């Protein structure tokens, strides 16, 4: 199990990214717009740099909702492969069965 501080840090990053998402999108639209003047685009770049570093969604790491494990996490379930296996064998995930051919 991952340390609780790491799990909480990821939650904080996700919350911060969600908070600044509209502002980041607006600034990036200005930066990408070729119709805008160079100075406007430059100022938008500077403003984007002033945003908190953890507001960038690429700094987020997918973690298991139960254990906090950072690797082997399935996006569809939000769980690590180990926990998916345990829960699937118990029959707690509807429609998920072990493959056999």
UniProtKB/Swiss-Prot annotation:
Pfam families per the UniProt record, alphabetical: Ribosomal_S14
Gene3D superfamilies for the chain: 1.10.287.1480
InterPro entries to which the protein is assigned, alphabetical: Ribosomal_uS14, Ribosomal_uS14_bac/plastid
Domain of life from the UniProt record: Bacteria
Keyword Ribonucleoprotein: yes
GO biological process: translation
GO cellular component, one term: small ribosomal subunit
GO molecular function: rRNA binding; structural constituent of ribosome
Keywords: Ribonucleoprotein, Ribosomal protein, RNA-binding, rRNA-binding
Keyword Transcription regulation in record: no
Similarity section: Belongs to the universal ribosomal protein uS14 family.
General function of this protein: Binds 16S rRNA, required for the assembly of 30S particles and may also be responsible for determining the conformation of the 16S rRNA at the A site.
Assembly, per entry: Part of the 30S ribosomal subunit. Contacts proteins S3 and S10.
PANTHER family assigned to the protein according to its UniProt record, in alphabetical order: 30S RIBOSOMAL PROTEIN S14, SMALL RIBOSOMAL SUBUNIT PROTEIN US14M
Protein's recorded name: Small ribosomal subunit protein uS14
Organism of derivation: Cupriavidus pinatubonensis (strain JMP 134 / LMG 1197)
């Amino acid at each position: 199990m991952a340390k609780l501080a790491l799990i909480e840090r990821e939650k904080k990053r996700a919350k911060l990214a969600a908070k600044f998402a509209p502002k980041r999108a607006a600034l990036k639209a200005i930066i990408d717009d070729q119709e805008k003047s160079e100075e406007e685009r430059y100022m938008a770049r500077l403003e984007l740099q002033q945003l908190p570093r953890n507001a960038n969604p690429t700094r987020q790491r997918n973690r298991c909702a139960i254990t906090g494990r950072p690797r082997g996490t399935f996006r569809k379930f939000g769980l690590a492969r180990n926990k998916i296996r345990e829960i699937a064998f118990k029959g707690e995930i509807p429609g998920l069965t072990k493959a056999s051919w």
